[in-house]
Amino acid sequence: MAVEYRLTLAGDIPLEQVAELAAPGAVETSTASGGRMLSADLNDEHGYVVDITGGRHGYYSAEDDGGALWQWEPEAYVDVSFYMRKDTLFDKGKPHMLATVARILAGRAEDAALTLNGDVLMLTRTAGTTQKHNTDGWYDEDYDRIFHL
């Protein structure tokens, strides 16, 4: 069973620009519905597979701190989805994924959100301010140096 982390950036952003930050060797494929997707299998190097897709009229919801429902509806968006096996999650996948998320956030200025399995809110960035959420379940103080928080 895989664990999915998804970073969503608000805006009409070319997928290639995000791929330069997330997975420079990503190859173009298509989604099940025929949309564009850039994908890279980085299991050996980083412990995950990454897919980059875009869309319009997005709707996202997840559990915020304290169990409240967080909702977001970006007009246009790009999703960077990281899929990792549970056996590589802690030693390889999660640290590399968080470093990649930090690199994307440093290289892009758009509002953003990071979720776990589509239902737990981890990070949001609104108007340039990044906020951590549900830190008991995932955050370690060592990550402060990755995110420069």
Give residue ranges: language-model regions.
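Short, extreme N-terminal segment that most often corresponds to the first beta-strand
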Residues: 1-39, 148-149
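Intrinsically disordered, low-complexity segments enriched in small/polar residues
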Residues: 3, 46, 57-58, 136-137, ...
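Residues in well-ordered beta-strands of folded domains
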Residues: 8, 81-83, 115
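Ampiphathic alpha-helical segments that act as solvent-exposed interaction surfaces
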Residues: 10, 14-24, 86-111
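Generic low-complexity, intrinsically disordered sequence content enriched
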Residues: 19, 25, 42, 46, ...
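Short, intrinsically disordered low-complexity segments
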Residues: 28-91, 124-126
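Acidic, proline/glycine-rich low-complexity IDRs
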Residues: 99, 103-149
